[in-house]
Regions:
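Metal-cofactor-dependent catalytic cores
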Residues: 1-151
Length: 151
């Protein structure tokens, strides 16, 4: 059985998360979601302006943030800080469960990476949008309510 981190444990690990680099981060993990609740860890991937992470199912997922309930074009890629994810996941094998396609060792705070910033990942340049990526019910189930509130 998985033990979720408590708020106190998360607070204790926050200093390490805050040591994330502001520039010159590292791509630590690429996770493709070929279908709902499926994960495939990749060594490399292609990014596309129309598809996001090629082979990912983001374009089959509806959004409450669009008028028609369809996929949100500003939410093709989800990025999470690797230090934060390691803190909440505990076991490295659980990191792919987060649902974020790109796991980076980089400060992702809005002060360091505000909306419309450009971020180079390999040969690709992505634009940070103004769409927040907050946890969902699946995130809470996988990592606990304290981790959800800690986002």
């Amino acid at each position: 059985m998985v033990e979720f981190r408590t708020t106190d444990q998360l607070q204790a690990g926050l200093a390490e998360v805050e040591r994330s680099p502001i520039d010159d981060g590292t791509l630590e993990l690429i996770v493709q979601r070929p279908a709902t609740d499926e994960r495939e860890v990749l060594d490399e991937a292609a990014l596309s302006a129309t598809e996001g992470l090629v082979g990912d199912s983001w374009n089959q997922r509806g959004s409450s943030r669009t008028d028609d309930g369809g996929p949100h074009p500003d939410m093709q890629l989800n990025i999470i800080n690797s230090r934060f994810l390691a803190l909440i996941a505990g076991d490295p094998e659980r990191m792919a469960l987060a649902g974020d396609q790109l796991v980076v060792d980089l400060s992702l705070g809005s002060a360091d990476l505000p909306p419309w910033s450009l971020l180079r990942i390999g040969d690709s340049v992505i634009e940070v949008t103004d769409q927040p990526h907050t946890g969902c019910a699946k995130f809470t189930k996988r990592f606990g309510l304290d981790a959800f509130h800690f986002l």
